[in-house]
Amino acid sequence: MIHIEKIPNGSLQENCYIIADGTDALIIDPGSDAERIIDTIHKLNVIPQAILLTHTHHDHIGAVDQVRDAFSIPVYVHELEQDWLNDPEMNLSAQFTTIPVTARPAEFEFTLYQEYHFGKLHFTVVPTPGHSFGSVSFIFNDFVIAGDALFKGSVGRPDLPTGNLDQLLTAIKTELFSLPPETVVYPGHGDETTIAQEQKNNPYFN
């Protein structure tokens, strides 16, 4: 049985997710509040295997190094945004925060459309660019972690560096709307939704 723990964190209420099956766990987008994320891992009594990044804007990476070091686990990222981890201009912390956000390079870069296995957990990485050009989503059996691509009733901002609205909408229609309609969508901000709900109600597609 997969357990999904959502930890809204930071001033932008970015959703960090802990995905667990038994004692195997993955940490997705640890944006800030490292101590809270680490405490939650201990309370769940799980063993994290890796940190996965949907993209590398500052609100999704601020706790990467603290969490990585606490559990001695690797970080995975799209190759196009590997350099952004240590670049406050590209991860936008130079523009939007008082203290620049940086992290060490990720240990691994995703191979798109590959299925990854971490203990009992397995998922496929698909490209969902448009909010940023290295944005990805993680497709599990009956849910998807969509980062800042698709939100409940909206989509990610396309007006940031390397963003593109047409590319974003095409990626959502191609990679996410092709999933079963009952698939639950866990976004980078806000509440979860379903593919069917967004196909029916999202103003960007209606």
Task: Show the residue positions of the predicted features.
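Conserved N-terminal entry element of GNAT/NAT acetyltransferase domains
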Residues: 1-3, 118-122
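Conserved beta-strand hairpin/beta-sheet module of binuclear metal-dependent hydrolase folds
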Residues: 1-44, 137-147
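Short Gly/Pro-enriched turn/cap motifs at secondary-structure boundaries
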Residues: 7-8, 107, 127-129
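Glycine-centered loop/turn positions within well-structured domains
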Residues: 14, 25, 82-83, 134, ...
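Conserved S/T- and glycine-rich ATP-binding loop of Class I adenylate-forming
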Residues: 19, 54, 128
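Residue-level marker for buried hydrophobic side chains located in beta-strands
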Residues: 26-28, 52, 75, 145, ...
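Active-site HxH/HxHxD metal-binding segment of metal-dependent hydrolases
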Residues: 33-117, 203-204
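Metallo-beta-lactamase
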Residues: 91-94, 122-206
